[in-house]
Each structure stands twice: as C-alpha cells, then as structure tokens.
C-alpha cells in the first residue's frame, strides 16, 4: 500500500499536467468546430445580402436585349382585341334543361361570363332584336317562339369570342351542324335550334346593350386567365 502511494505521489504532477494539456486541446478543438459551424450570423440568411462575403464586390445584373425578347409575345397578346358576344338560350333550350351544358362549353373554351339573367322576353324586345328579319315570312312565328317562354341572356368576353362562339354553336340548320357543336348535338329543326349567338363583334356590342341594362354586367378577372395564353 505504501509503495503504491509513493508511486502515485511521484507521478501525480505529471498525470495532472497531462490531463490539463488534454483538456485544453479538447476545448480548443470544440471552439474551432463551433466557429466553423457558426460561419453565418444568426441574424443572416443564406440568400440575403448579408451572407455574401464582403471581399467580393456587389454587382447588379441588367436584362439584356436578348432576354427582353422573350416577353414580346406577351406584349403582342396584351394588345389583342378582346371582343364581346351576346349568347341567348332560347325557350326550347331552357325548357330542355340545356343551360348548364351550354354555359359549361363556353367556360371550358376559356371565355369570361360578364352577364347572365333569366327572364321573359317581351314582344317589343324580340322585334327590336330581330328587326333585320322583319320582312321575312317567318318573322311573326319567330317572335312568337322567342316570347313563348323564358330565355337566358348571356354576355361573354374574350379574344376571338365571336367566331369561336359561332363554331361552338354550329350551323343555323341543326341538320347541317357538325357533331360536337351545340346545335349538332342537341337540335334537329331550325325552328327549335336552342341558341342564338352574335355574328360579329359590332352586333355583339349592340345586342348586349339591348338586352342588358346599365350596371347588370360584371367586370372581373378569372384566376385561370394567365393559363389561357402566353
């Protein structure tokens, strides 16, 4: 026991010195590791200007002429003419429950609905709408048909809405209308051809002004608009 105590005592100072040296190296290694892990300030962000080394000069990137050309199609698209079309579901289309189907086809095409109402058309309004046909032998029968029940008046808006609407609707004579068109799919006779659509942008504006009063149209922006055109 005494021998062991003497041996331990003789080496006590050396052992203590070794432990102190080892602990110092460990703390120094931990300190360097912590400093390396803390390269970014706690208040900084990897993508913020403060995270950029001050030894590198800051530069500002300007758009080149070749890059600006990418946006030219968008500029052209923004200048495209947005037209209006008046679409009316006639009494037979309303009675047959085709209003939803017709609206769906125009919506799926990407056009914007700005006016919609269901009402009973008066004789005076029908005669004004079809005044270009007042010399035709079928005119009285046409007026009787349009006023025989409620109609659904719609105002649609979009680039090329008038010619596109005519294609969606189909030929006046349902027997000549292509399959896939509204008249081609749902009508069989000219006297019951379900739907009316403006035949020109000018008539579209005129008919909308005739069938809708001031304040009845709604101006809005569909969320799908950026996905319709470049």
Swiss-Prot record:
Enzyme Commission code: 2.7.4.6
GO molecular function, one term: ATP binding
Compartments in which it is found: Plastid, Chloroplast
GO (cellular component) term, any one: chloroplast
UniProt main location, coarse: plastid
Span of chain positions assigned to the transit peptide in the UniProt entry: 1-64
Key words of the record: ATP-binding, Chloroplast, Kinase, Magnesium, Metal-binding, Nucleotide metabolism, Nucleotide-binding, Phosphoprotein, Plastid, Transferase, Transit peptide
Top-level taxon of origin: Eukaryota
Active site location: 196 (pros-phosphohistidine intermediate)
Catalysis performed (reactions): a 2'-deoxyribonucleoside 5'-diphosphate + ATP = a 2'-deoxyribonucleoside 5'-triphosphate + ADP; a ribonucleoside 5'-diphosphate + ATP = a ribonucleoside 5'-triphosphate + ADP
Family annotation (Pfam families): NDK (PF00334)
Cofactor(s) this protein cannot do without: Mg(2+)
Alphabetical list of SMART domains matching this protein: NDK
GO BP annotation list: CTP biosynthetic process; GTP biosynthetic process; UTP biosynthetic process
Residues binding ATP, per UniProt: 90, 138, 166, 172, 183, 193
Sequence similarity: Belongs to the NDK family.
Role according to the record: Major role in the synthesis of nucleoside triphosphates other than ATP. The ATP gamma phosphate is transferred to the NDP beta phosphate via a ping-pong mechanism, using a phosphorylated active-site intermediate.
Protein name: Nucleoside diphosphate kinase 2, chloroplastic
């Amino acid at each position: 026991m005494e021998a062991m105590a003497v041996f331990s005592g003789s080496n006590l100072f050396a052992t203590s010195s070794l432990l102190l040296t080892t602990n110092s190296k460990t703390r120094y290694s931990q300190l360097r590791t912590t400093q390396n892990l803390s390269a970014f300030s706690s208040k900084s962000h990897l993508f913020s200007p403060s995270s950029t080394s001050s030894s590198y000069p800051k530069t500002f990137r300007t758009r080149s002429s070749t890059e600006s050309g990418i946006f030219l199609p968008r500029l052209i698209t923004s200048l495209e003419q947005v037209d209006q079309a008046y679409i009316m579901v006639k009494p037979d289309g309303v009675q047959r429950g085709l209003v939803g189907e017709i609206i769906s086809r125009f919506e799926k095409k990407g056009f914007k609905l700005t006016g919609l109402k269901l009402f009973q058309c008066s004789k005076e309004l029908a005669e004004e709408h079809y005044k270009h046909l007042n010399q035709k032998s079928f005119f009285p029968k046409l007026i009787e048909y349009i006023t025989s029940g409620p109609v659904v008046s719609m105002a649609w808006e979009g680039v090329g809405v008038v010619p596109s609407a005519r294609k969606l609707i189909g030929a006046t004579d349902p027997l000549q209308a292509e399959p896939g068109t509204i008249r081609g799919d749902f009508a069989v006779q000219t006297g019951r051809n379900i739907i009316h659509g403006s035949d020109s942008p000018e008539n579209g504006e005129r008919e909308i002004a005739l069938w809708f009063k001031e304040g009845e149209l709604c101006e809005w922006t569909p969320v799908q608009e950026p996905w319709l055109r470049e």
